[in-house]
Amino acid sequence: MEIQMSDIYCEGDLYSNDDSVTIYMTPATPLTYENNKWVYHQMPDVSQFKEDMRRQQVLHADNGVLAHLKFEFPENVKPNADMMQLLRAEGFQVGNLELYMIEATDLRQLTGPSLEIEPVTLENMADYMHVYEPLSIQFGADYIKESAQALLTHLKKASRALQPYIAYENAQPVGIMNMIETERTVELDGFAVAEEARGRGVGSRMQAFVGEMARERPVILVADAEDTAKDMYMKQGYTFVSFQYSALKELTVSVPH
């Protein structure tokens, strides 16, 4: 089975899609960069990217998305020297996400402490946020508030592709994760273990649960190429599939129309 970055789920609202670029625009979550981005299918040249910067800035401003610009480049294509020079000159942070996969049978071999892992509901949403908030406060109180509202809205949907889960140990919330199930794959996203619960195999036991849910489907995830988390995934048996460069510019002033 061929796995690609296009198999990775995006919670953002699809604004437009053509052979060149897919645009996600989600005014309800303006501080969630992942939900407001342009994904290139063909690598733009420098002049095209300059024009797209201007177009994205206007589109974002028209929709109340004032904090950033974000672009993702085609899978397995590194921006050339001219593009990298432009990105740095324009104040973009250049990132590199890596796609990993593992067979569900391998995940099921992981061990850890006894946990109760439950889907997030309106009734236990506060437990999810109890783990989420300390790990995300670095992005600001407004981001936490937006995330909580987005989760509440999401949980009220009759059907949803993404299902959040909470892991409890001795009735205390110690871990959170999102699972996106399709016929082909199960994606693991938003995976986090509370600081005080780390180093005891909680994360391994949570992933074993994902392996159980996946049955025969491969499990996929993305990790930052510079993040130490990817080393953990590789030790657990995940294999590298592909990479994708991105460019993020955080804006500190209001965007003019």
What are the residue ranges of the model-derived segments?
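N-terminal charged segments
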Residues: M1-N63, K78-N80, M84, S147-Q149
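Short amphipathic alpha-helix that is part of the acyltransferase structural core
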Residues: E2-S6, M43, D106-A148, P256-H257
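Conserved beta-hairpin
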Residues: L14-D18, D82-Q93, A161-G175
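Acyl-donor-binding surface of acyltransferase catalytic domains
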Residues: F49-E116, A247-K249
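Conserved acetyl-CoA-binding loop-helix of GNAT-fold acetyltransferases
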Residues: F49-Q57, G190-E195, G199-E212, D231, ...
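Conserved GNAT acetyl-CoA-binding A-motif
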Residues: N63-P74, M213-A225
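Conserved active-site alpha-helix within GNAT-family acetyltransferase domains
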Residues: K78-V94, S204, E226-F243
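A conserved beta-strand-loop-helix scaffold within acyl/acetyltransferase catalytic domains
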Residues: Y143-A192
